[in-house]
Amino acid sequence: MSIVATKLRNGSGAKGTQEGRDVAIDIRQTTLFPLSKVTNTSRNTYAPPWEWVAASVWTPRMLAALETNGVRGGKWHSLIDKVYTLPNLDAAWAEVKANKGAAGVDHQTIEHYERDLEANLSKLAAQLQDGNYVPQAVKRVWIPKPGSREDRPLGIPTVRDRVAQTALRNVIEPIFEVGFAAHSYGFRPGRGGQDALRRVEQLLDAGDTFVVDADLKSYFDTIPHAALRERVATKIADGRVLALLDAFLHQEVMSTVDTTTPEAGTPQGAVISPLLSNIYLDPLDQLMAARGREMVRYADDFVILCRSQVEAEQAMSEVQDWTTKAGLRLHPEKTRVVDLTQKGGFDFLGYHFERGSKWPRKKSEQKMKDRVRAITKRTSGQSLSAIITQLKPILQGWYEYFKHSNRGTWRPLDQWVRQRLRSILRKRCHRKGRGRGADYQRWPNAYFEAQGLFSFVAAAARNGQPSKR
């Protein structure tokens, strides 16, 4: 089947001219990432299907007003009553329960909250309606940072606060979602990393080989509260909804040492934080779109793909100016212009792109190997069958995300995993750590295949990608 997708700066139709040149992408010549079901391939824009909205909040009449901007002054009034309705709180609770999560500072687990669910939701509804709701402190814990010896902070709101945040998000997310730029892919209904990666590959194949590789420094922790609130207020005029948002922004953070009140940033661990982060960066998205820049953004990770060094430097200058005015910072050592016609490349969403090729970046591979190492220690007392069972979801899940990598990626990884297992078997047989040829003869690849070990090469073959020896 022949598919040709046309890349346009103006998005006006099936074929267009950019800088005096016809630009088209023949998907037959590339291995593209799959496109989500909600991305409109004919216009390369985002057409939101409203199945994801909370039906308990958004009536057909409200959705019609949303699509036509048919509200007074372009702002939405009287929304707080939509937040505290029991159907909305019940829908929010269902999502919180499905997402699981630990107890917050009140030590109340999801199971405990559910034991008296009707009373808990009724009490929360009354507090939100009366204006007496005050979020509790966020519990801060430190967890290992993957691929690093450092720890990173994790915020855990109480179950009650997670329900309230989800209820608020159910109300305000569609108001902003309808206007978000097409090139924003992170934390949006029906969109994901695969869509963003696919767009990057399309642009590279079309000749946009000068890349602004941008890195926002500590973005989620540095968003100015006042400026964020102003952006939310451009579409929401309900003072009580804005006050509820303020309460979450100034939510205390409690650690084992002290309690602090954040002066900037989105709430740690909050359900609403991803939406707020997109709201704050949307003006940058709109600026890049207005100036014809091919930007692809996933949360705070974004690249701008250009046709020339001059265009890329101009785009980077525009981003630097905007971030400075917005109270944000670009990492000076990690923000750069990359010329893909020369040696070198860039990383985006776990992949490394370089001169027409792509493969898992080193850090992505290292994280996977660290997880494998933890299971395949030579001192492990588990049976080989038990070890292979534990490895399967790790290897299979990693492959599913990176399966669009170059075919030469897989064989070395298979060899590495099998060698880890051979080392375990060799130790159990009290064989010295030499004579690996004998190990291969005693435990050939077919032996591990019979044991059910997941194989990257075999998975790639099933996916229609021949192995590269």
Give each language-model segment a name.
Residues T335-K343, Q390-I394, P412-R418, R434-Q441:
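A glycine-rich phosphate-binding loop feature that marks nucleotide/adenosyl-phosphate handling sites
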Residues H112-P135, W398:
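Amphipathic alpha-helical blocks
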Residues H250, D321, A326-G397:
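A conserved non-catalytic segment of reverse transcriptases
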Residues R420, L425, C429-R469:
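Extended C-terminal regions of large enzymes
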Residues M1-E118:
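Non-catalytic, polymerase-adjacent accessory regions of viral genome-replication enzymes
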Residues Q127-W142, P146-E150, V171, G179-G345:
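Conserved polymerase palm-domain catalytic core
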